[in-house]
Swiss-Prot record:
It comes from Arabidopsis thaliana. Residues 575-586 have a biased composition (Basic residues). Residues 554-600 are annotated as: Disordered. It is found in: Cytoplasm; Nucleus; Nucleus, Nuclear body. The lineage of its organism: Eukaryota, Viridiplantae, Streptophyta, Embryophyta, Tracheophyta. PROSITE patterns: ANK_REP_REGION, ANK_REPEAT, BTB, ZF_C2HC_NPR. This is Regulatory protein NPR2.
């Protein structure tokens, strides 16, 4: 006679779910039947809680409890786990671990998450949340910074950080085939989805592509919200899977909620922008059928086109940067939603009003803050590593909001009087921008793009050699050219360099290089709050080592220049033996291992 295995599940609350299985492991992956908790006696409930707590402590302290494998996430971060537990709980892990070959018996097994979850990159906190449930059968609250945005006035119930976190855990629950977690998280998401900003609703539709119809209830509710919203058709078409876009159009038609259709001339402008053809846009405007404001072309370019295309369209200065689209968004609001610092700075320089609010009272700064995860914003990056764009946008907008008067960038540039002064200033600014590019790559790329530095010719130390590139195509400026031509080309380079430096000083004050380039007294560089005399001395010594490295490089290049038939006098070194004003090759490691911070 066959033996029937009975499975019971006790749910104590929305955050607890335990399986009490007769004849199977507690962590059996099979689905279970639901029974009221009163079927379990108090001692049984206490025993299950104790077991859950013990297993959760095993996960939270993996090294203490002899974990034997690591899950490697994108970026190299690792989560320790126990193969026996995950193999029993998640069939996908059992299959993946079976294919892993250990090189040595003592070597910890490492499993790449991308080999299991191939279609979407998930964060550390999402992985920990799902694996904690696998161990304990209990849904734990995520760390505050993992599902909270930067805005202190936000309740963090339905902001973008919360949406991103929920999408990630829903995806992992689907990939790991944990049906009970799929149900729990979908139910939680349905409780908050009505509070989500309509632009963030579009993010949820990723689940359709990733998980098919697994989250049909959630996706159907999102479709209902989008149908009744005023979001533009062009945004829907570019953001949604084609079948969902068509479904929304059909429902709107049935409910007589169709928005006005775009005119043919506006569509042509959008097509030209999609093709990154700003020249074609100019030709279409000459026909006189419409203009950039009537077509909301700048809004479209900022939202959907390449950064260069949007920047080139803005540089035409044919559109009102403070114009609101039918949904009440200015161009700056749209740039904030995109979290692109170059576009935000460009708009501010063109006169965009940072204090303009959306119809629901959000400024551009609030928009960016609610799109940026708190953990990402609070995590400081080391010099030389890329900064996150969300944090840069917040930095720019916060600084700009404090300014009472925005002086023109060009006002700080006084033209050099003599060729020697021009050469000295070029060498100084080339040095400064090169160092900034080394230490703050994203910030420098942002401001030098606005200053159009790449459109000018770099001035290098080799340009000082009289016989440089004789008989070859010139790739940098040559001082043997006619004086007027030299002066004009160098002035263009100097203007771009100065504008790059001034933009960096204005919008990224923490990236100041004054303590490298212009310090007359090293004592003030070493004087930092909470420093000890020993630390100040160490900093001062390290600074002197850097100067010696740079001076040694200069001396070697000077000897090479001296071998030429017509040596030229040089003033590349200040009389006080400060940093040499020339374009130098510097080792990134020399700066990354210095003991002091960025400072102003």
């Amino acid at each position: 006679m066959a033996t029937t295995t009975t499975t019971t599940t006790a749910r104590f609350s929305d955050s607890y779910e335990f399986s009490n299985t007769s004849g199977n492991s507690f962590f059996a992956a099979e689905s279970s039947l639901d029974y009221p908790t009163e079927f379990l006696t108090p001692p049984e409930v206490s025993a299950l809680k104790l077991l859950s707590n013990c297993l959760e402590s095993v996960f939270d302290s993996p090294e203490t409890f002899y974990s034997d494998a690591k899950l490697v996430l994108a970026g190299g971060r690792e989560v320790s786990f126990h193969r026996c537990i995950l193999s029993a709980r998640i069939p996908v892990f059992k299959s993946a671990l079976a294919t892993v070959k250990e090189q040595k018996s003592s070597t910890t097994v490492k499993l790449q998450l991308k080999e299991i979850a191939r279609d979407y990159e998930v964060g550390f906190d999402s992985v920990v949340a799902v694996l904690a449930y696998v161990y304990s059968g209990r849904v734990r609250s995520p760390p505050k910074g993992a599902s909270a945005c930067v805005d202190d006035d936000c309740c963090h119930v339905a902001c973008r950080s919360k949406v991103d976190f929920m999408v990630e855990v829903l995806y992992l629950s689907f990939v790991f085939q944990i049906q009970e977690l799929v149900t729990l998280y979908e139910r939680q998401f349905l409780e908050i989805v009505d509070k989500v900003v309509v632009e963030d609703i579009l993010v949820i539709f990723k689940l359709d592509t990733l998980c098919g119809t697994t989250y049909k209830k959630l996706l159907d509710r999102c479709i209902e919200i989008i149908v009744k919203s005023d979001i533009e058709l062009v945004s829907l078409e570019k953001s949604l899977p084609q079948h969902i876009f068509k479904q929304i159009i059909d429902i709107r038609e049935a409910l007589c909620l169709e928005p006005p259709k775009l005119e043919r001339h506006v569509k042509n402008i959008y097509k030209a922008l999609d093709s990154d053809d700003v020249e074609l846009v100019k030709m279409l405007l000459l026909e006189g059928h419409t203009n950039l404001d009537e077509a909301y072309a700048l809004h479209f370019a900022i939202a959907h086109c390449a950064v260069k295309t949007a920047y080139d369209l803005l540089e035409l200065e044919l559109a009102d940067v403070n114009l609101r689209n039918p949904r009440g968004y200015t161009v700056l609001h749209v740039a904030a939603m995109r979290k692109e610092p170059k576009l935000i700075i460009s708009l501010l320089m063109k006169g965009a009003n940072i204090l303009d609010t959306t119809l629901d009272g959000r400024t551009a700064l609030v928009i960016v803050k609610r799109l940026t995860k708190a953990d990402d914003y609070k995590t400081s990056t080391e010099d030389g590593t890329p900064s996150l764009k969300g944090g840069l946008c917040i930095e720019v907008l916060e600084h700009e909001q404090k300014l009472e008067y925005l002086s023109p960038i060009e006002a700080s540039l006084s033209l050099p009087v003599t060729p020697e002064e021009l050469r000295m200033r070029l060498l100084y600014y080339e040095n400064r921008v090169a160092l900034a590019r080394l230490l703050f790559p994203v910030e420098t790329e942002t401001v030098q793009g606005i200053a159009k530095l790449e459109e000018t010719c770099e001035f290098t130390a080799s340009s000082l050699e009289p016989d440089h590139h004789i008989g070859e195509k010139r790739t940098s400026l040559d001082l043997n050219m006619a004086p007027f031509q030299i002066h004009e080309k160098h002035l263009s380079r100097l203007r771009a360099l100065c504008k790059t430096v001034e933009l960096g000083k204005r919008y990224f004050k923490r990236c100041s290089l004054d303590h490298f380039m212009d310090t007359e007294d090293l004592n003030h560089l070493a004087s930092v709050e909470e420093d000890t005399p020993e630390k100040r001395l160490q900093k001062k010594q390290r600074y002197m080592e850097l100067q010696e490295t740079l001076m040694k490089t200069f001396s070697e290049d000077k000897e090479e220049c001296g071998k030429s038939s017509t040596p030229k006098p040089t003033s590349a070194v200040r009389s006080n033996r400060k940093l040499s004003h020339r374009r130098l090759k510097v080792d990134k490691r020399d700066f990354l291992k210095r003991p002091y911070g960025n400072g102003d």
